[in-house]
Regions:
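A short beta-strand element within the Helicase C-terminal
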Residues: 238-243, 467-491, 519-524
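Walker B catalytic acidic pair
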Residues: 224, 245-247, 489
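C-terminal accessory/interaction regions of large nucleic acid-associated machines
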Residues: 10-93, 112-117, 564-837
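Structural recognition of the conserved hydrophobic beta-strand(s) that form the central parallel beta-sheet
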Residues: 181, 220-223, 243, 278-284, ...
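Conserved C-terminal RecA-like helicase domain
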Residues: 110-123, 130, 134-141, 150-157, ...
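Conserved interdomain linker/interface between the two RecA-like ATPase lobes of SF2 helicase motors
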Residues: 270, 277-399, 441
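SF2 helicase catalytic motif II
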Residues: 233-278
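Conserved segment of the helicase C-terminal RecA-like domain
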Residues: 273-280, 480, 492-493, 499-541
């Protein structure tokens, strides 16, 4: 039974609140019970400043103050009079939350409200058009000193911006020349490339691990996998500084989906720490990350590491709400915004469900929320709906359209360019077009680089997309900023890695410095305990505490092959390896980490049983259908795909002919639309084959080509274009990104390096396919300057664009830029170029 209110663990003692004037008025103003009263608000901030000056205040009180400063700036900045503005400024300076002075809603003509001392202090802190707090300034100075740094801070603290800005200073002063960024995903690499290009002019950025040129000044952007390949060929290259973003990946060695990447990063850190290269770790707000887990990975003395983490005061804040539905179908919210000084989470009526409601049905929860979303949030402000599956994403998006929630009157040029791109390259029938035209975007792992980038830019910078519906894949991309976040999930939060870190990472999407300094977070009761979930929300601004010893114990009980590879590697010297204690050291090659040392031995035995020249011939002719087909057949046998526990490898990839055709099409730069039409035509011409719709072990539908002979059509249905085309588009997007770009390339790469180890020969054709999915020199040149979208690469390598290349087939960047600016603003090619160079 629903309660009318629930007790909250108050952020401060009653004796403290007794000294704050008009707190109840401020709380009522926030609830729209009171109206704006200049006198009362001035008295409230007077009492805050008085308390700050007369007491030793702790982090809890500071958060309370930040909450109300964020509230007043975000909601009433245009009404703030001179007297109140000066008081707010004084508090901001006293609490060292300087960046708020430059908030877009607040900074206009602000300088005249400072005294001379404050003006000098502000001038000193102003770096790269940003105003730094003491902590940020300290971090900057330690980077300038090229220290080892562990920088853990809340979302929107500006960690990556501080690093890029300071690295820029070091490069321009010739203090450093070669910088390495280790980043977990290609999406983050693309985002970093964009940020670096905006800040550091004329710097060479390299993503290709096979580059051997020793540049005088260069920034390398690598995933862990790519760094190992680079290191294999460039062991003598001296790196001046290393930055590892998303370093929390290191705690995921007990997560089945994450352990491979975690151990690859662990191996890299072992290499870097042995070289004595200074390193910066960036990660979300974790309590003492160096002392709890990072120190176990690197061979660096504690006194040589600067740790910036605990008691970090965020500049932004959130309102937290739990949504519940009672037995009468009435939708309520409970306000758990602890930092507002609330003592009780009061129950507030929102609306009544128009149909029957099952509290254990996520579909019913989605329906009642979407049907009443205008009563829950201010729909003029951007929102994100987080859910657990791609099917749920589509259902929610379709209901938003049905209710005309996000209808937009005008479409920006960039949005029109995105729609044009989808129509030409993905398919006219793709439902994402309908979503976008109705002001809604969906975000899932299979969307290609162009769609992902445009959606993220439009959502952050334009007004076309008001709502975003996503799964946990949002956590792997760049920061998307929305004032409102609604979470619709069942009993358990669906995390990629550590649950507490991922949960806080998601919550951090709502409040962002310079955009929305105070956000609104909504979670559903489902059949969870509301008090417990409410507490989880209002403690999400606290640092995560990691029990890494417990994680190590879990790993030791059932270590997988990659963990064993690390634990037995004679080249690794780390406390983690010592604690894993899995036997005598052995000589392990760096590239054995891709499949594990035991699997590597089996693979090399199989390779030795055939003529090496046979494999070399297949690899050199990769892209030719017959040779690619033979190569994939060999890979399936060498790596025993049928025994692989991964459904995609053991089931989806056993159709060798389909995988070969798909791979050749990808390597030739074919669009999704073209590949789908080719497959449909293939089945129509070859009566022995059928296109069918199946379900995977998770119940999600996908389309596949099957040979009619010996196929049981139970649990399948024949593909009908009008009904199943969207399923096919999603399937093809998935197959390209996951089956070809991830799995197939992984096995091609491993085979190639084992062959190369034997005959010492470089096969450029393979390296180019692995890095660029092409062997065309012009396409590779485009890729090297950051143009990664296949449609743009295919267009720009046509004969009519030869003027953009020099005699070595390198890009004339200025000429290409000039051409891009001449294109219509609704042309997708314009943004494929200008977004990255």
């Amino acid at each position: 039974m629903n309660k009318n209110y629930m007790k909250i663990k108050r952020c401060l003692d009653e004796s403290v609140f007794a000294q704050i004037d008009n707190l109840k008025y401020m709380q009522n103003l926030r609830d729209n019970i009171e109206t704006y009263d200049e006198k009362k608000i001035n008295e409230f901030f007077d009492s805050l400043m008085e308390y700050i000056l007369l007491n030793n205040i702790d982090i809890k009180f500071k958060r309370f103050v930040v909450f109300w400063i964020d509230y007043i700036i975000q909601n009433y900045s245009v009404k703030i009079n001179n007297s109140l503005r000066k008081k707010v400024n004084d508090i901001i300076i006293t609490l060292d939350i300087y960046p708020l002075l430059y908030d877009k809603n607040y900074c206009k003509n602000n300088i005249k409200y400072f005294n001379l001392f404050d003006e000098i202090s502000i001038k000193i802190r102003e770096k790269n058009n940003k105003l730094l707090s003491n902590v940020q300034y300290y971090a900057r100075n330690k980077i300038l000193e090229r220290k080892n740094i562990v920088f853990s801070a809340p979302t929107s603290f500006g960690k990556s911006s501080i690093v890029i800005d300071t690295i820029k200073e070091l490069i321009y002063c010739n203090k450093i020349k070669k910088v390495l960024f280790i980043l977990p995903t290609k999406a983050l690499i693309n985002e970093y490339r964009r940020k670096i290009k905006e800040n550091i002019e004329d710097i060479i950025i390299i993503e290709n691990p096979h580059v051997t040129t020793d540049f005088s000044k260069v920034i390398y952007l690598f995933t862990p996998e790519r760094f190992l390949v680079f290191y294999e060929n460039n062991k003598n290259v001296k790196i001046d500084y290393v930055i590892n973003d998303e370093a929390q990946i290191l705690v995921n060695i007990n997560k089945k989906k994450c352990v491979g990447r975690s151990i690859l990063l662990a191996k890299i850190l072992s290499i870097i720490s042995e070289s004595k290269t200074p390193i910066i770790f960036l990660l979300p707000y974790v309590s003492k990350p160096f002392d709890t887990f990072i120190f176990k990975y690197i061979n660096i003395d504690r006194e040589d590491v600067i740790q910036i983490s605990d008691d970090m005061l965020p500049f932004v804040s959130n309102n937290y709400y739990m949504l519940d539905v009672d037995e009468n179908g009435d939708l309520f919210k409970y306000d758990f915004s602890k930092d507002a000084g609330l003592e009780f989470a009061n129950k507030k009526y929102i609306a009544t469900s128009n149909c029957s409601f099952n509290k254990n049905s996520l579909e019913d929860w989605s329906n009642i929320i979407i049907d009443n979303i205008t009563k829950i949030i201010n729909i003029e402000k951007k929102f994100i709906v987080f859910c657990t599956s791609k099917n749920q994403i589509k259902t929610i998006a379709q209901r938003l359209i049905k209710n005309r929630i996000c209808k937009i009157d005008n479409i920006s040029y960039r949005m029109q360019a995105l729609i044009n791109y989808i129509e030409n390259n993905i398919g006219l029938e793709f439902e994402l077009i309908t979503f976008l035209k109705n002001g809604i975007a969906v975000h899932f792992s299979e969307i290609d680089s162009y769609i992902r980038r445009q959606i993220e830019i439009i959502f952050n910078e334009e007004n076309d997309i008001k709502g975003m519906v996503c799964t946990s894949t949002l956590l792997q991309g760049v920061n998307l900023n929305a004032q409102n976040l609604i979470m619709i999930y069942g009993n358990r939060f669906s995390a990629i890695g550590n649950v507490d870190i991922d949960f806080r990472n998601l919550v951090g999407r709502s409040a962002r410095l310079g955009i929305n300094i105070q956000g609104n977070i909504y979670n559903i009761a489902y059949n969870k305990k509301i008090e417990k979930e409410g507490e989880r929300l209002y403690t999400s601004s606290d640092p995560v505490k990691i029990n890494f010893d417990k994680i190590i114990k879990e790993v030791k009980k059932n270590p997988n092959e990659i963990v064993k590879t690390y634990a037995l590697d004679s080249q690794v010297r780390s406390k983690l390896k010592d604690e894993l204690n899995m036997g005598n050291d052995s000589s392990i090659e760096n590239l054995d980490y891709f499949i594990g040392s035991e699997s590597a031995k089996k693979v090399e035995k199989k390779i030795s049983e055939k003529d090496i020249d046979y494999y070399v011939d297949l690899l050199k002719n990769i892209g030719n259908y017959e040779k690619t087909l033979l190569l994939i057949q060999e890979l399936s046998q060498i790596y025993e795909w049928e025994k692989n526990p991964d459904f995609d490898v053991s089931k989806r990839m056993k159709n060798i002919e389909y995988i070969a055709r798909l791979a050749v099409n990808v390597f030739n730069g074919e669009s999704i639309r073209t590949m789908i039409n080719k497959n449909i035509n293939f089945v129509q011409k070859n009566k022995d084959y059928s296109l069918v719709v199946c379900k995977n072990i998770m119940g999600s539908e996908y389309v596949r080509i099957v040979h009619k002979k010996n196929i049981d059509f139970t649990n399948m249905h024949i593909f009908v274009r009008e009904r199943d085309i969207n399923t096919y588009i999603y399937t093809m997007l998935y197959d390209v990104q996951k089956i070809i770009e991830f799995y197939l390339k992984k096995y091609i790469q491993d085979l190639y390096y084992r062959i190369k180890r034997i005959n010492k020969d470089t096969i450029k054709e393979v390296e180019e396919i692995l890095d660029y999915s092409t062997k065309d020199k012009k396409k590779i040149s485009l890729n090297n300057i950051g143009i990664v979208d296949n449609f743009a690469i295919s267009l720009l390598t046509r004969e009519e664009f030869s003027e953009f290349y020099d005699f070595n087939e390198n890009i004339k960047i200025d000429k290409l830029k000039e051409y891009a600016y001449s294109l219509p603003e609704y042309d997708p090619l314009r943004y494929a170029i200008l977004d990255v160079i």
